[in-house]
Structures are given as C-alpha cells and as structure tokens.
Regions:
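Two-component/phosphorelay signaling modules centered on CheY-like receiver
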Residues: 10-33
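Conserved RecA-like P-loop NTPase ATPase core
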Residues: 17, 88, 146
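CheY-like receiver
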Residues: 36-124
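Residue-level signal for beta-strand positions within conserved beta-sheet cores that form or flank
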Residues: 25, 74-75, 128
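Conserved binding/recognition cores within well-folded domains
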Residues: 114-159
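Short acidic capping loops at alpha-helix termini that bridge into adjacent secondary structure
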Residues: 28, 75-77, 145
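Extreme N-terminal starter segment of soluble prokaryotic enzymes
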Residues: 1-3
Length: 159
C-alpha cells in the first residue's frame, strides 16, 4: 500500500483524514500542521503521496508544490484538500494528482487512491531501460540484459 503524509493546518480535518487513510490501509508516515516542517521532512524522507490543504496560512498551494519540486528527496503525488469546490481547478493547475473536498468522503478518497496506484503501476510497467552514466555520457541498457546490481558505498555496479 502507498505511504502518505498529511499537511493540514486544521487539527480536526487532519485527524479525520488520518482515520480515513488508516481505513484505506495507507501507511501514514507523519502529520504536519505547518508547511515548513513538512518540506524539511520531505527533503530527507520518501513518501508516495502528500495530502495537503491548498489554502495553508504560511504558503499557498503553488508555492508548496514548487518547494517540493526543489527540495523533496523523491517527487510524491500531491492530493490537495479544500473546503471550496472552486479550488478544484486550481489544484489541477498546480499539477496535483487529485483533490478532495472537505469534509472528505471515504468513497472519494478511495477513488483518488485507486487512480494514484494505477498511475504508479503504469509507470512501473513502462520501465524498459537502466540509464547508466559511463564516463561522462549516459548509456541506456535494457533491463533484461542486467544480471545483477551490486552496491558499494555510494556506487552501484550493473552487471
């Protein structure tokens, strides 16, 4: 199942989403009530999905997404939560995977999760080549030709 964090300044809304995510068997790694600690956490941890309020007080959704792109260890899917339906279009303009209207309904949450899981499955199925840097140039090697990988310190060897 996917892993997630919640970034929501409203404590009750965060708690409601936490309960729903647990019911959907999502591995909840952390809950943040401010954007800055979440961004710091994302710079050193990996997560599949970030559920974030589109209207956080310290930074708006656009700034939050831009900072994630600059600082996150791995780019997660973003699902914005909002109390206003008119913010839905804005969520997609911000390259969100989906949006959820508050109060969040279980069926709508499950639909969003199913879409993200399917999208990630398609990405995994489309993997065809390793991209390997070989003396200043990149070489693509079909994954079927790789016999094994060996990691040593900060280097990975492909055989």
């Amino acid at each position: 199942m996917p892993s997630a964090i919640i970034v929501e300044d409203e404590v009750l809304a965060a708690e409601r989403l936490r309960v729903l995510l647990e019911e959907c068997n999502v591995v909840l790694l952390n809950v943040f009530h401010h954007a800055m600690p979440a961004l710091e956490w994302l710079s050193v941890h990996e997560v599949d999905i970030v559920f974030a309020d589109i209207g956080m007080p310290e930074i708006d959704g656009l700034e939050f997404v831009e900072r994630i792109k600059r600082t996150a260890k791995r780019q997660p899917e973003i699902v914005f939560t909002t109390a206003y339906e008119e913010h839905a279009l804005r969520a997609f303009e911000l390259a969100a995977a989906d949006y959820l209207l508050k109060p969040i309904k279980m069926t709508r949450l499950q639909t969003a999760l199913d879409r993200i899981i399917e999208k990630n499955r398609e990405k995994a199925d489309s993997f065809t080549h390793f991209k390997v840097y070989n003396r200043e140039r990149m070489v693509e090697i079909p994954w079927q030709q790789a016999r094994y990988l060996m990691a040593e310190h900060k280097t990975v060897y492909l055989f």
